[in-house]
């Protein structure tokens, strides 16, 4: 009989190879990436365009444009679009991030031919109707006003502004007046400039059932437009570490954001740094969780992670604590940073974190959608094809001395920006 009081032995992770995508360059220069998997009769279609915040000529125009894409086309109202998507049990949404805009369709495979014309119409013929535009602007401003009542939201805003600078798109704060001043003409012009299908990266995965050619015909027509101007904005060189405490009268909570510029994913030590970050604050048994949550009882949770954008990467440590406990929490974070610099990580702890990192990675590849997410990251971040194979190899091979060296180079408390809001 199985003895459930004894944990099963940990097995080493075998070599990981992502499924190879079929890549086709379409007549208009767009690229179609296909990852077939017929385990379930479902499909996901994603169209990625260079229409993120980094490309906008006016603040928050990328956000406004993406959120208006489903609000009406030349042939359909927003209600008609929503009804058609719901009728087929599908989902369709469009979002804008720091670097790109992403339109995503999930549907049953048999409905893909029916829904493709709708997706094409949404991408190429949005009309940005005035009534829906006004309502969206009002809703968005109200939502931001609600979010800004939270110290955690304001701390993140201020941290990004201090890290990247107020003039850099990654560091710009949401400006309510500027957002309300955006017009339908602004959205139409940005759509014309930043949403050409010739610049699209199209990702099709799931039970594609021979529909690749139909997708290629849908998104491959039209002229090969000029590349979207996305002026390279290197990481600000005037970053200044230090402390920035913003008092919030009447607030019982304080939100902490601590971090610094961080090596990009293309850096040769990126996977070792990922392991170091995991040990610091990347899982429930991390150093920060054990100290600040379990031992000191200052918070329900604390994290450390690297945030990758196409033109800059940052390390961020974040938590919410009682206002009176903020100085102690900052001091304990700095204490844990110095411990990693001054002490070798015990072999047992290092082995636990390696197993956690590799196990979580394997679990994150359990569906074709998740596999496609990893592949898409390689494409958009221009990473080597064996990036995730390197992750497994370097994670397994990294020793405590290497992590201590990296901590001494990158985790000095004096090199951090400390933001306390509350």
Residue ranges and their predicted role:
Residues 1-6, 80-229, 294-422:
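Charge-rich, well-structured scaffold segments of protease-associated domains
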């Amino acid at each position: 009989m199985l003895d459930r009081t004894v944990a099963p032995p940990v097995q080493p992770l075998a070599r990981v190879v992502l499924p190879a995508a079929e890549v086709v360059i379409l007549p208009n220069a767009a690229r179609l990436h296909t990852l077939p998997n017929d385990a379930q009769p479902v499909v996901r279609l994603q169209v990625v365009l260079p229409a993120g915040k980094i490309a906008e000529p006016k603040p928050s125009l990328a956000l406004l444009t993406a959120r208006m894409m489903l609000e009406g086309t030349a042939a359909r109202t927003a209600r008609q679009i929503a009804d058609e998507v719901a009728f087929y049990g599908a989902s369709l949404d469009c979002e804008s991030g720091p670097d790109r805009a992403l339109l995503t369709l999930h549907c049953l495979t048999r409905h893909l031919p029916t829904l493709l014309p709708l997706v094409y119409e949404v991408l190429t013929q949005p009309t940005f109707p005035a009534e829906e535009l006004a309502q969206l602007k009002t809703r968005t401003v109200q939502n931001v006003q609600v979010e800004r009542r939270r110290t955690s939201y304001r701390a993140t805003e201020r941290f990004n502004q201090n890290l990247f600078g107020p003039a850099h798109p990654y560091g710009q704060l949401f400006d309510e007046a500027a957002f309300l001043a955006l017009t339908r003409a602004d959205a139409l012009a940005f759509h014309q400039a930043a949403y050409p299908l010739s610049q699209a990266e199209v990702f099709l995965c799931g039970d594609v059932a021979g529909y690749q050619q139909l997708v290629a015909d849908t998104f491959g027509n039209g002229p090969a437009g000029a590349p979207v101007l996305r002026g390279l904005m290197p990481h600000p060189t005037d970053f200044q570490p230090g402390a920035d405490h913003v008092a919030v009268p009447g607030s019982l909570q304080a939100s902490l954001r601590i971090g610094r510029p961080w090596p990009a994913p293309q850096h040769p030590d990126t996977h070792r740094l990922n392991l170091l970050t995991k040990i610091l604050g990347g899982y429930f048994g991390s150093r920060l969780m054990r100290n600040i949550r379990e031992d000191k009882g200052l918070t329900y949770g604390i994290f450390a992670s690297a945030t990758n954008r196409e033109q800059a990467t940052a390390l961020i440590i974040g938590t919410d604590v009682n206002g009176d406990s903020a100085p102690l929490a900052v001091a304990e974070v700095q204490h844990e940073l110095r411990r990693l610099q001054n002490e070798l990580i015990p072999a047992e702890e290092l082995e636990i974190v390696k197993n956690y990192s590799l196990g979580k990675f394997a679990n994150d590849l359990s569906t074709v959608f998740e596999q496609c997410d990893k592949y898409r990251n390689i494409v958009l971040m221009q990473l080597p094809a064996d990036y995730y194979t390197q992750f497994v190899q370097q994670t397994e091979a990294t020793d405590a001395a290497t992590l201590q060296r990296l901590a001494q180079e990158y985790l000095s408390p004096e090199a951090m920006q400390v933001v306390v809001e509350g």
